[in-house]
């Protein structure tokens, strides 16, 4: 009886340990490097972005994104875009997944409150992946805050933003409707001439993945924004 009780307790401990381990998120350290060119001709606005993402402990290319868009400046505070994104996902062990995205975007400079500039970016994506036939629909909402630091900092601003991703449907290539991921960034924005800036900081991403459940990424984010 005592032996059976010990075996039962040992089994329960193993089950509890396994459940706790499986519930813990997979973590990774990454480096994201982004270069985006912004410009306009009259009321026509455009941007083009290239972004390699290096993962697996900053040891190998995980993803690369090419993202151009053309838009219309409604006024100084509101711009509407139609764009396309080409995505190569190198995170799969066996092959490279290709994703094509069409997206519509609303950029809105909400205003300034107590010295803090607030802006919003809403993006609706239609996603096609090489691993399936279905079209995935995803909504993204980004809220950004920027506060200029004292003048002796030379025009540097403290920046923070958060972005929520929500999948709107299930697909045969793995997406499930509901929470997809959330990102939170904190860092500095440095002027480099004209309206161009460099943004550097820490980006945290919590994502729901098909393979591991929850993945937590700690990212060094380097961004060059060239504005004409």
UniProtKB/Swiss-Prot annotation:
The keyword Signal applies. It comes from the Bacteria. Residues 1-23 form the signal peptide. The keyword Signal applies. Keywords: Signal. This is Uncharacterized protein MexAM1_META1p0181. It comes from Methylorubrum extorquens (strain ATCC 14718 / DSM 1338 / JCM 2805 / NCIMB 9133 / AM1).
């Amino acid at each position: 009886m005592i032996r059976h009780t010990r075996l039962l307790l040992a089994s329960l401990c193993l089950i509890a340990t396994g459940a706790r381990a499986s519930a813990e998120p997979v973590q990774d350290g990454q480096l994201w490097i982004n270069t985006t060119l912004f410009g306009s001709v009259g009321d026509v606005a455009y941007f083009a972005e290239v972004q390699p993402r290096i993962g697996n402990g900053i040891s190998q290319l995980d993803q690369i994104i090419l993202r151009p868009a053309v838009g219309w400046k409604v006024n100084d505070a509101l711009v509407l875009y139609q764009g396309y994104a080409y995505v190569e996902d190198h995170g799969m062990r066996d092959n490279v997944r290709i994703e094509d995205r069409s997206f519509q975007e609303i950029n809105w400079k909400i205003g300034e409150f107590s010295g803090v500039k607030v802006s919003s970016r809403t993006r609706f994506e239609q996603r096609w992946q090489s691993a399936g036939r279905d079209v995935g629909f995803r909504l993204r909402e980004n809220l950004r805050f920027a506060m200029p630091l004292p003048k002796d900092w030379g025009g540097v601003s403290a920046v923070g933003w958060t972005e929520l991703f929500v999948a709107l449907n299930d697909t045969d290539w793995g997406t499930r409707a509901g929470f997809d991921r959330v990102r939170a960034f904190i860092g500095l924005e440095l002027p480099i001439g004209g309206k161009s800036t460099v943004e550097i900081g820490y980006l945290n991403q919590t994502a729901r993945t098909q393979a591991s459940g929850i993945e937590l990424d700690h990212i060094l984010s380097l961004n060059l924004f060239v504005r004409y």
